[in-house]
Amino acid sequence: MSTITSAIPDQKKVGMVSLGCPKALVDSERILTRLRADGYAMSADYAGADVVLVNTCGFLDSAKEESLAAIGEAIAENGRVIVTGCMGEEADAIRAAHPQVLAVTGAHQYEAVVGAVHEHAPPSQGPYVDLIPQPSEADIKLTPRHYSYLKISEGCNHSCAFCIIPQLRGKLASRRIDAVLREAEKLVAAGTKELLVISQDTSAYGVDTRHEAKSWKGREVRAHMTDLARELGQLDTGDGTPPWVRLHYVYPYPHVDAVIPLMAEGLLTPYLDIPFQHASPKVLKAMKRPANEAKVLERLKGWRAICPEIAVRSSFVVGFPGETEDDFRYLLEWLEEARLDRVGAFRFEPVEGAAANALPDPVPEEVKEERYARIMELTARISAEKLQRKIGRALPVIIDEVGEPDEDGDIGATGRSQADAPEIDGAVYLRNVPATLAAGDIVQVTVEDADEHDLFGAIARV
């Protein structure tokens, strides 16, 4: 639940439960920013809220179950609940499970959800529109101050067989490049040290607008991933250094190659999140994904030649309909050669409305589980081998949390290297840090040990 309080008498308070991906989190921030402009405060718990918003996820059946459970908990604890987000597109299913909900709105229907809050918990004060920026430039953050998600577009033009994002979020709709850069500049000025660029398809940014250029700092800048990355890398965090800039959800188009030199130059964090999903040409074709796994291996080698520090994260689906043991072994062999830095895997789940549901030869659940265990075992071993090579090196680390002194007075801290995005990747655990260290500080750390996913070390002596 968000915590933003106010001393204004009788001010109505809103609670927020945000589920799902970082893109949904950005939507939650935007909704809360608008509500604060309209005179609301935010409640840190159910008891203090006049109404509770539940921003749902509807991508997988398991996510829908989690969303319905969260709605039920909010109803039990508070009783006045408004539902929004991706599962909001299934209003009948929500009302069948929880008829007490006050209102249901769909994904990124900002005006509708704000209107529902006004209807069921009218603000006791007038709007404070002069106190904060426009809603498109999120003022309320649900992440720590030192990192922020920067959403550059909504929707997707692909028709992957396992996905219903286009039905939930629509076709690609890119934000104006100048609006994105203004938001990024504002976030950095407010203390953000790390920008995480997100969308449904970051590589396609600007395709729908034919990469329309806008004026920025006296020059024309195109709405294109490469141009955006270059501009973000020129922002100043206040000490003469740029923020860390990570690219997430990058579809492997050929023009992705152009951002690798920016990483080598230090303008962009050497990190790419590319959801390859599989390696077997047969499975990729069934998924309606690009099937050129050999070319991907060549590109990985080329990227590493240009920027040896690059970390590549990806996600894969196991147990897709028609996936044979040979297909799965092909994937494992491909992963052995690709040696990706960070890997997430998911067991295939049928999603209502997805084309994959009609495919023949479903994989039994016990086979999915066995394959999931095998892919996680392999990728954990590869990760451990790669992290072992970092022992003895000094790496830049951004601090996420500083602990309390132990009985000996030693203070520990947790941070992340440039190879680690928040919440989904590994961590760096530091020992005996100075009491002056704070979240958001970027320090050089000497790596002393490593396991399958995390590093351990101490601040390097200058």
Curated annotation (Swiss-Prot):
Domain TRAM per the UniProt entry, residue ranges: 388-461
Residue sites binding [4Fe-4S] cluster 2 per the record: C156, C160, C163
Record-annotated Radical SAM core domain positions: 142-385
InterPro entries reported for this sequence: Elp3/MiaA/NifB-like_rSAM (IPR006638), Methylthiotransferase (IPR005839), Methylthiotransferase_CS (IPR020612), Methylthiotransferase_N (IPR013848), Methylthiotransferase_N_sf (IPR038135), NA-bd_OB-fold (IPR012340), Ribosomal_uS12_MeSTrfase_RimO (IPR005840), rSAM (IPR007197)
Gene from which the chain derives: rimO
Organism field: Erythrobacter litoralis (strain HTCC2594)
All residue ranges annotated as the MTTase N-terminal domain in the record: 12-122
Major subcellular site: cytoplasm
Highest taxon listed in the record's lineage: Bacteria
Protein name: Ribosomal protein uS12 methylthiotransferase RimO
Protein EC: 2.8.4.4
Cross-referenced SMART domains: Elp3 (SM00729)
Keyword vocabulary terms for this entry: 4Fe-4S, Cytoplasm, Iron, Iron-sulfur, Metal-binding, S-adenosyl-L-methionine, Transferase
The protein's required cofactors: [4Fe-4S] cluster
